[in-house]
Amino acid sequence: MSMAYLAQPEQQQNLEWLDGGTLAMLLDGKATDGQLMIGRFDVAEGEAPPYHKHTREDEVFLLIKGTALVWCDDQEYELAEGGVVYLPRNIPHGYRITSKRADLLMINTPAGIEGMFRETGRDKSTPRPPGFEVKPDPGLAAKYGNVIVGPPR
């Protein structure tokens, strides 16, 4: 049964992500009865995940602040501040942040992919182990229905 859910900033989990960025987990499947996951990235210039596709969920990116290059099915696009991208499942995609910093909202439906982010990243409320680095893991990605198609672009 679905219920309304309110998550104040202090209730949101913050994960260390690629290249020292932060992923704030705004809503997850537990909060939305599996319907969707919403995360917000604070990342620096050059941050780029591997070129990949999702087999279980559709994805929307809203670039709140900053600029990026986006690749969708091998087509390259420039995404300006305020731009939005819809990525249906099974469409290979990737991005690279081209501004000094970027604020990127990500919505996935249905939920589930947050498990990959939690297993790959590090909860920033815990001590940082010496030498810790977020590294994409193809096996872990596959566990959550993601297929790494190639290196970051």
Residue ranges and their predicted role:
Residues 32, 89-114:
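Ligand-binding loop in jelly-roll beta-barrel domains
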Residues 39, 64-65, 80-81:
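A cytosolic small-molecule/anion-sensing beta-strand core signal
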Residues 47, 55, 67-68, 118:
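Hydrophobic small-molecule pocket/channel-lining residues, especially in calycin-type beta-barrels
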